[in-house]
């Protein structure tokens, strides 16, 4: 039986000790950007990518900190590589000026550009991938002006699969994970097994080394779905690493991923961040409250915030969520790298692994907000009250005594809620989240 890592693990496991440190601070803070996949899937071309870049500026997203415009799967010729150079060939029907032409135009807008490949023989959509061609592809990416690589885990040949299976309690791997354990896992690793020696780690390290060998700094985003206990080696390999299978614009999937990622927060710090996948804000049939909770949790966890909706048709409410200044300020804190942590589960007893009801109470220190970030989440299907008790919040409990008051600000409205004594109670609609800055004592 294998158990998912919890926040109670030793702080010696925190990211940073063996981090992949890049020039100019690239990857020190979690990435902010946009990606084609959740909006368009394989139906991409230069026009859609450039429209997203232009809208990133027009909508004020660049000013809010979003900087990467990322091209996901399906950008190349599907039939194979150039027979002479062995390079991947951009699809000229989709990208008439090549990837370099698009990259140049994006750079002219003051933004950065990302590309996609996989640590296998083909991508998830069946296009040429980079296993065995890492050096050639890294050189191509650098020559084209690429700033970000999302590196997936599809097309892995049998000789590159892992000897053992790691516990990833995600619905993409089954449905029976009692409190985050994997009792039915096939071929579990020995207790002392070093996953950094696994084939998965070696496949991802090969591209890391190739990227480090080119004359361009390229942020490296691992998309290995939480496999091979990536949390124990991902920080030395890439700037972020996926912790689960793919997200979808379904509330049940969003809270499932939030639950899984919440147990991995001790691995997040400067230069390395567990990645619960790209944002679905603005997609599907999510309610306003669900969009808000999704974004607030991802920002509080200091996950990469990669927008995945069509920006030329986004509505004002969704745009306002993506541009929320206090949450982005917490997310991009230059002094404090650690994310918010759950301090109370609320609906469940503490430390309960529940795909439908993640931890509901979160807090985190901030050098930018003038106080502590506090989230209260209603995971239930009807309106409920939630109460933040100052003496329960780790950042406040040493100074909070009965009758203690703090200046409180509502992050969503910007409203100064005044001097609040002892606790703050709020009624939340189904799947909504309260976000507060708890500031100076009063």
Swiss-Prot record:
GO biological process: carbohydrate metabolic process
Signal sequence bounds: 1-19
Binding site for substrate: 224-228
Name this polypeptide is given: Probable alpha-galactosidase B
Enzyme Commission identifier(s): 3.2.1.22
Alphabetical list of SUPFAM superfamilies matching this protein: (Trans)glycosidases, Glycosyl hydrolase domain
Recorded catalytic activity of this chain's protein: Hydrolysis of terminal, non-reducing alpha-D-galactose residues in alpha-D-galactosides, including galactose oligosaccharides, galactomannans and galactolipids
Family to which this protein belongs: Belongs to the glycosyl hydrolase 27 family.
């Amino acid at each position: 039986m294998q158990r998912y890592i919890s926040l109670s693990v030793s702080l010696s496991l925190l990211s940073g000790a063996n981090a992949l440190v890049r020039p100019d601070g690239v990857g020190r803070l979690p990435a902010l950007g946009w990606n084609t996949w959740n909006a368009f899937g394989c139906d991409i071309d230069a026009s859609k990518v450039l429209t997203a870049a232009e809208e990133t500026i027009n909508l004020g997203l660049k000013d809010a900190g979003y900087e990467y415009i990322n091209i996901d799967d399906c950008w190349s010729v599907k039939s194979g590589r150039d027979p002479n150079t062995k390079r991947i060939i951009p699809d000229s029907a989709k990208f008439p000026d090549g990837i370099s032409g698009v990259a140049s135009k994006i750079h002219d807008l003051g933004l950065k550009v990302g590309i996609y490949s996989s640590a296998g023989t083909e991508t998830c959509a069946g296009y040429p991938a980079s296993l065995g061609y890492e050096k050639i592809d890294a050189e191509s990416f650098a020559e084209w002006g690429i700033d970000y690589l999302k590196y997936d885990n599809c097309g892995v040949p049998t000789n590159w699969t892992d000897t053992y299976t790691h516990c990833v309690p995600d619905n993409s791997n089954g449905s029976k994970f009692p409190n985050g354990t994997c009792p039915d896992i096939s071929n579990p690793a020995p207790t002392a097994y070093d996953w950094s020696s696994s084939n998965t780690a070696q496949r991802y390290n090969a591209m890391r080394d190739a990227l480090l060998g080119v004359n361009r700094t390229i942020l490296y985003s691992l998309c290995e779905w939480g496999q091979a206990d990536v949390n124990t080696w991902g920080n030395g390999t890439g700037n972020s690493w996926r912790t689960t299978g793919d997200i979808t614009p379904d509330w049940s999937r969003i809270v499932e991923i939030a639950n899984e990622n919440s147990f991995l927060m001790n691995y997040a710090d400067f230069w390395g961040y567990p990645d619960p996948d790209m944002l679905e804000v603005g997609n599907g049939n999510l309610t306003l409250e669900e969009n808000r909770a999704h974004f607030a949790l991802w920002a509080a966890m200091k996950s990469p915030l990669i927008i995945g909706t069509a920006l030329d048709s986004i509505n004002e409410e969704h745009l306002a969520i993506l541009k929320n200044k206090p949450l982005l300020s917490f997310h991009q804190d230059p002094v404090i790298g650690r994310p918010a942590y759950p301090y109370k589960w609320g609906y469940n007893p503490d430390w309960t692994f529940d795909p439908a009801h993640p931890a509901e109470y979160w807090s985190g220190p901030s050098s930018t907000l003038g106080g502590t970030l506090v989230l209260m989440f209603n995971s239930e299907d009807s309106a409920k009250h939630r109460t933040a008790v100052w003496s329960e919040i780790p950042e406040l409990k040493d100074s909070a005594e009965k009758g203690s008051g703090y200046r409180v600000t509502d992050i969503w409205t910007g409203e100064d809620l005044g001097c609040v004594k002892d606790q703050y109670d709020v009624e939340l609609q189904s799947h909504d989240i309260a976000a507060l800055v708890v500031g100076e004592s009063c």
